[in-house]
Swiss-Prot record:
It comes from the Bacteria. SMART domains: LeuA_dimer. The gene is leuA. This is 2-isopropylmalate synthase. InterPro entries: 2-isopropylmalate_synth_dimer, AIPM/Hcit_synth_CS, Aldolase_TIM, IPM_Synthase, LeuA-like_post-cat, LeuA_allosteric_dom_sf, LeuA_N_DRE-TIM, PYR_CT. Pathway: Amino-acid biosynthesis; L-leucine biosynthesis; L-leucine from 3-methyl-2-oxobutanoate: step 1/4. The keyword Oxidoreductase does not apply. Keywords: Amino-acid biosynthesis, Branched-chain amino acid biosynthesis, Cytoplasm, Leucine biosynthesis, Magnesium, Metal-binding, Transferase. Coiled coil: none annotated. Belongs to the alpha-IPM synthase/homocitrate synthase family. LeuA type 2 subfamily.
């Protein structure tokens, strides 16, 4: 079977919402939603191998440490394992006073009773009721009409009131999800929710949660936003209701749907860390939270050690996070492209502490989420001078002059082409040493004596040439001019730069020389030494030897 030439014969577009006076497109997200993690329930039930109790507890503690205040811990009536986990959290004191446990149940009395029993002794708890409401589920799965579906929800809501009254020591919050909300007729979804509200009788001080799932993502995010805005306008007792979003990622727009839903007036977001969940996953709470953060809003969730959080999630879920996953993937703060690297390097150079973040290609400062700058720039055959210069400067304190960056990038390019792999900072530094610092043929500087008198310098350089030692002597206005005067070839210095590497008594000097030998093409040399004069002499010999070697290679 192949893709249809006319898919409209098999699939139909989801109808738009009649909301000509919609207001959400002109809104911004300026308030932080209530966050609810469903990792231990929705996320766990989607795993090939569900978490055991130890993994669940480890995950729970991670969610608490991040700052998630509402955590859906399990489906207690589904298994003894889930029931026991809730008991462990309560009896062993794993629920902080500012954190609320949430559990899920279907709309059957035996399951509801078991669910409330699992929560006995909890200081506060959210009990989450659901039943599917959309036409396809009513017809295909349950063989129920609208009245039957509504009756299921209302009867279950009454049972919530009954069993909660038997445990008055717990502060109860009730939550109802018209499952498949986004595929349900809006008027009917409202009708069912209104009926549930009537039973639960919420107040502004004791609100109910109406969770409106895109159980399966069936339309573009703007349609979901229209549904949320319409619902918020029309639901009864809006001041006593928290509207909660629960999006999935079937069409790849779970984050967008959530953000537009918040613009449309929602108060709360359910999801999973890094987007685990049924099929293509629930909305990623991390992405939504850090999207807020990069708009200048503190999301109330702390991902200062995002790699530590990822490690827990990967080990508990046994699913690796994709290297391109927003904010946390191994490659999301990495640039291989030469133009990107150059822009990033310039951005880091100009970025001042305490100023607005404006580094190109990096929407967030990696340091804010515990990432080092080490992996920001990586070098492969597509890389340019900016990335190479950045790595040498960050890792080794070596600041190559601009024209030398261009020259050395060609050396690195040849090496990456030869290897067919990316190069690490260590490999680039090794190549710099081999190409420049160890360029000692045909002339190797062994030692030198420098004398200065009345503004004039004289140099006696001991040089190893073809197996024997020679002394080159010269005079000039400065040390370099004196050394050049003593060379056996005509050398013209085009540019000279120097800087310190490190500080204090252990600091070294780096010197860079650009020169031409006998009128040939200009080349660069590098010298590093504790003494700045020695460093400059080594740089001159480095450039001299490289020039002569290139001339000889060209002649051959």
């Amino acid at each position: 079977m192949t893709m249809l030439k006319d898919p409209s014969k098999k699939y139909r577009a989801f109808p738009t919402i009649d909301l000509p006076d919609r207001t959400w497109p002109s809104k911004t997200i300026d308030a932080v939603p209530i966050w609810c993690s469903s990792d231990l329930r929705d996320g766990n039930q989607s795993l090939i191998e569900p978490m055991d109790a130890a993994k669940k507890l480890r995950f729970w503690k991670t969610l608490v440490s991040v700052g998630v205040k509402e955590i859906e811990a399990s489906f207690p009536s589904a298994s003894q394992t889930d029931f026991d986990f809730v008991r462990t959290l309560i009896e062993d004191g794993h629920i902080p006073d500012d954190t609320t446990i949430q559990v899920l149940t279907q709309a059957r009395e035996d399951l509801i009773a078991r669910t409330f029993e699992s929560l006995r002794g909890a200081k506060k708890a959210i009990v989450h009721l659901y039943n599917a409401t959309c036409p396809s589920f009513r017809r295909i799965v349950f063989n129920q009409d609208k009245a039957g579906v509504k009756e299921i929800a209302v009867n279950a809501a009454k049972l919530f009131v009954k069993y909660a009254a038997q445990q008055p020591e717990t502060q109860w919050t009730f939550q109802y999800s018209p499952e498949t909300f986004s595929a349900t007729e809006l008027e009917f979804a409202k009708e069912v929710c209104d009926a549930v509200i009537e039973v639960w009788n919420p107040t502004p001080e004791n609100k109910v949660i109406l969770n409106l799932p895109a159980t399966v993502e069936v339309a573009t995010p703007n349609i979901y936003a229209d549904q949320i805005e319409w619902f918020g306008r029309n639901i009864t007792r809006r001041d006593s209701v928290l509207i909660s979003l629960h999006t999935h990622n079937d069409r790849g727009t779970g984050v967008a749907a959530t953000e537009l839903g918040l613009m449309a007036g929602a108060d709360r977001v359910e999801g999973c860390l890094f987007g685990n969940g049924e099929r293509t996953g629930n909305v990623d709470l991390v992405t939504v939270a850090l999207n807020l953060y990069t708009q200048g809003i503190n999301p109330g969730l702390d991902f200062s050690d995002i790699d530590g959080v990822r490690k827990v999630v990967e080990e508990c879920n046994q699913i690796p996070v994709h290297p391109r996953h927003p904010y946390v993937g191994d490659l999301v703060h990495t640039a291989f492209s030469g133009s990107h690297q150059d822009a990033i390097r310039k951005g880091f150079t100009q970025q001042k502490e305490g100023e607005l973040w404006e580094v190109p290609y990096l929407p967030i400062d990696p340091a804010d989420i515990g990432r080092s700058y080490e992996a920001v720039i990586r070098v492969n055959s597509q890389s340019g001078k900016g990335g190479i210069a950045y790595l040498l400067e960050q890792e080794y304190g070596i600041s190559l002059p601009r024209r030398m960056q261009i020259e050395f990038s060609q050396v690195v390019q040849g090496e990456t082409d030869r290897l067919g792999l990316e190069m690490t900072a260590e490999q680039i530094h090794s190549l710099l040493r081999r190409e420049y610092l160890q360029a000692n043929v045909p002339y190797a500087l062994i030692s030198h004596k420098l004398q200065e008198e009345n503004g004039n310098s004289s140099v006696d350089a001991e040089v190893h040439v073809d197996g024997e030692t020679q002394h080159w002597r010269g005079k000039g206005k400065g040390a370099l001019e004196a050394l050049v005067a003593g060379l056996p070839v005509a050398v013209e210095i085009m540019d000279y730069n120097e800087h310190a590497i490190g500080s204090g008594t252990t600091a070294k000097a780096a010197a860079y020389i650009e020169l031409r030998v006998n009128g040939e093409r200009a080349v660069h040399g590098v010298g590093i030494d504790e003494n700045i004069t020695t460093a400059s002499f080594r740089a001159l010999f480095s450039a001299l030897n490289r020039s002569l070697s290139q001339t000889q290679a060209k002649a051959a």
